[in-house]
């Protein structure tokens, strides 16, 4: 298994698809060190694939929030909540060797990534830990559908409308 590999999962449709892929894989004894716990991580815990998830917050649908409240004693053994200053701390992320998968809205040909704003001004996602995890993870990637609005808008653009992370090395 990958028990010693710490995974950081971003928020969004592609990161959720990755969680679903893990659910249907042969991998087990996973550990997640991330900022936000979402529905897919609860499914992994329920399936016995995710041993523990460490995060700062929850972003759950109403059904999953209810499920967690109803089974709090069970989830208490699998979830650790930490202050943001610890969960996003560069030294901790590096030491654990986190593999990061962050969602993005758009990326440009210069290596800049916009993971927070639509059209440069409307906030879609919080600022979050994508910068912390991108800079400090052992392996870091941004994931996104290739297009939006039924193929009308490309996720790869000449210049992003808002720079959240510069991914050049």
Outline where the language-model segments fall:
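Short acidic, glycine/serine/threonine-rich loops at helix termini
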Residues: 18-23, 43-46, 93, 112-119, ...
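A glycine- and small-aliphatic-rich helix-loop capping segment at beta-alpha/alpha-beta transitions
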Residues: 23-29, 119-124
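Ligand-binding beta-strand-loop-alpha-helix segment within the catalytic cores
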Residues: 37, 41-107
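C-terminal catalytic subdomain
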Residues: 97-167
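Short internal beta-strands
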Residues: 30-36, 53-54, 141-143
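Glycine-rich beta-strand-to-loop/alpha-helix junction loops that act as flexible
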Residues: 8-14, 18
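Short, small-residue-biased leader/transition segments that mark boundaries at the very start
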Residues: 2-6, 169
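Short, surface-exposed connector motifs at secondary-structure boundaries
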Residues: 4, 23-28, 50-52
């Amino acid at each position: 298994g990958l028990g010693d590999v710490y995974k950081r999962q971003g928020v969004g449709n592609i990161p959720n698809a990755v969680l679903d892929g893990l659910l249907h894989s042969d991998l087990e004894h996973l550990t997640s060190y991330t900022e936000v716990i979402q529905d897919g991580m609860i499914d992994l815990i329920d399936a016995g694939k995710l041993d523990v998830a460490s995060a700062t917050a929850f972003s759950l649908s109403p059904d999953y929030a209810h499920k967690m409240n109803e089974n709090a004693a069970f989830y208490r053994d699998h979830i650790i909540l930490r202050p943001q200053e610890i969960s996003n701390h560069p030294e901790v992320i590096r030491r654990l060797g986190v593999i990061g998968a962050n969602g993005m809205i758009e990326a440009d040909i210069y290596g800049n990534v916009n993971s927070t704003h639509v059209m440069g001004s409307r906030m879609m996602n919080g600022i979050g830990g994508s910068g912390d995890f991108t800079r400090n993870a052992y392996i870091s990637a941004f994931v996104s559908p290739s297009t939006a609005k039924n193929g009308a808008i490309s996720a790869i653009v000449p210049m992003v409308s808002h720079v959240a992370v510069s991914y050049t090395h």
